[in-house]
């Protein structure tokens, strides 16, 4: 089986050529020979939600349309914001074949609602702040609400899986997330999903 490795550095950024290279690799893949894409996502602070969601959609579409393709997402160090979404999406939310998620080191996951930076300001705006939402253009408002709904759906899956284990989810953690705070947890290195 051939392998191709990619490294997503620091954050999901529209200026990072890795995303074009990944899309080109998948687009040119003919599904004849077995191929494994190894994507390293380490010490990632998040970045652009739109780029991250396009990355997630690319992985989903590629694996569902190519039976000889497997994808291994290797996390390490920390995964914040958009990177935390990718981790939680593939581990807790999506049931997609041939996607393996693992960490070779301890992993700190910091998950929070998506936000948009207000133009000409350093303020971040969350969708559940109606006053600040009005300062965004209509298109930005629509995007932020859509992003928030997707993040909330994945967060709901994280909570549901935890509670299926017989534990009650700490209400203060739910309040923190719903109040635009961070939810952080640290995991030991292991394979989280997909043993092939």
Where do the protein language model's features map onto the residues?
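N-terminal organellar transit peptides
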Residues: 1-196
């Amino acid at each position: 089986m051939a392998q191709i490795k990619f490294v997503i550095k620091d954050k999901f950024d529209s200026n990072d050529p890795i995303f074009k290279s990944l899309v080109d690799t998948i687009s040119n893949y003919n599904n004849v020979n077995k191929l494994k894409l190894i994507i390293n996502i380490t010490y990632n602070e998040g970045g652009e939600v739109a780029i991250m969601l396009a990355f997630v959609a690319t992985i989903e579409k590629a694996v569902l349309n190519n039976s000889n393709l497997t994808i291994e997402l290797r996390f390490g160090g920390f995964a914040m914001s958009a990177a935390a979404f990718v981790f939680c999406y593939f581990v807790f939310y999506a049931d997609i074949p041939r996607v393996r998620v693992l960490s070779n080191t301890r992993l700190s996951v910091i998950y929070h609602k998506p936000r948009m930076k207000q133009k000409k300001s350093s303020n971040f705006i969350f969708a559940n702040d109606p006053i600040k939402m009005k300062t965004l253009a209509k298109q930005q408002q629509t995007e932020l609400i859509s992003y928030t709904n997707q993040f909330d759906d994945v967060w709901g899956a994280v909570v549901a899986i935890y509670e299926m284990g017989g534990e009650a989810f700490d209400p203060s953690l739910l309040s923190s997330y719903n109040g635009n705070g961070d939810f952080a947890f640290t995991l030991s290195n292991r394979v989280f999903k997909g043993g092939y």
